[in-house]
Amino acid sequence: GFGRGQVKPEGSGVAFDSAQETFTARYTHETIALGFAITEEAIEDNLYDRLASRYTKALARSMAQTKQVKAAAPLNNGLPGLTFKSGDGVTLFNASHPTVAGTFSNTLSTAADLNETSLEQAMIDIAAFTDERGLKIAASAQRMIVPSALQFTAERLMKSQNRTGTADNDINALRNMGMVPGGYSINNFFTDPDAFFLITDVPNGMKHLERAPLTTKMEGDFDTGNVRYKARERYVFGVSDPRGIFASPGA
């Protein structure tokens, strides 16, 4: 992008700015596959139908579970100090994402558990997001994602009419102002029981790209007489713009 517009004195030329490429987010598709075999003897003993039905359901469940784990991996491994990095070379959730104009943060400056104070601070921090040239983009949170351990905390924070955890007769500002219009969802594949995440309205954030959809194949093996089944798909989960998501790893 460009910096702020410049005042043009009367009779002077227009100031020109230069657009710059920042970083490249790379996505490497993974091939996910799994198979099983039913022996020729099992087929002869009339076990084929029963085993095939049970095993194919188990195969589908395994493939679905793998996709869920892969989908959660950027969030699980992108917390401060872990291994998943965005295209700018730092962890997905970082206080110092580099930009042309300086840095920006998509995590709390002081890690905190999910409560009214930390969630309100997250709203303030998201609203302060800037683009590559330091211009404010007026970002806002759209949906919160929590591990199952935080589902009850999230329910109270999002839906109580009054403030939670206090005897003060104050309204629940987060609820009344509609700060998280999409509510919250639970992800059972998060590995940190006290981390919470906020999807923002910044486009090109978290992405799922599919190179080849799930397919299944079956064939007989001449040598053993076994019947073999396999399932296969290719996809990748990643992030293009870290501003698309905000997180706190918990205290």
Regions found by a protein language model. Give the residues of each.
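Noncatalytic linker/hinge segments flanking ATPase motor cores
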Residues: G1-G5, F16-A19, P74-G81, V236-G244
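Assembly/oligomerization interface modules of large self-assembling protein complexes
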Residues: G1-T31
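Polar low-complexity intrinsically disordered regions enriched in Ser/Thr and small residues
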Residues: R4-K8, V14-F16, F84, V90-L92, ...
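Generic structural "secondary-structure junction" signal
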Residues: H29, D45, N77, S86, ...
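Alpha-helical scaffold segments that mediate packing/assembly in large oligomeric complexes
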Residues: D49-R54, R61-D125
